[in-house]
């Protein structure tokens, strides 16, 4: 059974963190919790209690509800690069290929999302540079969703006219 959880759901002994040198990576602006959780999962056994033991308070002016900027997507993409590297380096189990596939898809998804937002922002010069440096990954990416595959193909096409048309259509769609 799949279980969704986040850092606020974990009870962790301080001794475990110190013995295994598990701390948040302060260089990551986003995704530091994911990086920490993945390293924690690799390092030790975990047990789940299938009950809600907390109450989530929704605050209207919370940062979690704020609009995402292009910088947010860039940091998120960078964080997933780092997570992929650290997990693949630390993991010693027998499911390395499966984990590689999942993390590669996740990394490609976040990178494609960042590039797509650069396209929608209209910074075609930056987009062209980023697509050039990620060309192979965009062409080979195995994203699960049709929309994400289509976006990766559009980005990998390096077709300036197509990029401008996509931006124009999306701007009109967002004005409705």
Features from the language model and the residues they span:
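Alpha-helix N-cap/helix-start motif at coil-to-helix transitions, marked by capping-box chemistry
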Residues: 6, 74-78, 105
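Inter-repeat boundary and helix-capping residues of tandem alpha-helical solenoids
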Residues: 30, 73, 101-104
């Amino acid at each position: 059974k799949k279980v969704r959880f986040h850092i606020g759901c974990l009870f962790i002994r301080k001794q475990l963190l110190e013995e295994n040198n598990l701390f948040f990576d302060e260089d990551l602006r986003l995704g530091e919790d994911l990086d920490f959780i993945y390293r924690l999962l690799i390092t030790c056994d975990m047990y789940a209690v299938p009950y809600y033991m907390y109450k989530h308070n929704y605050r209207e002016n919370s940062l979690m509800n704020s609009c995402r900027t292009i910088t947010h997507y860039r940091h998120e993409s960078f964080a997933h690069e780092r997570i992929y590297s650290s997990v693949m380096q630390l993991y010693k189990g027998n499911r390395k290929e499966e984990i590689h596939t999942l993390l590669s898809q996740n990394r490609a998804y976040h990178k494609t999302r960042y590039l797509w937002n650069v396209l929608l922002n209209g910074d075609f010069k930056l987009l062209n540079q980023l697509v050039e440096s990620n060309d192979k990954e965009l062409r080979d990416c195995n994203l699960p969703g049709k929309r994400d595959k289509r976006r990766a193909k559009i980005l990998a096409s390096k077709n300036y006219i197509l990029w401008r048309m996509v931006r124009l259509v999306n701007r009109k769609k967002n004005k409705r």
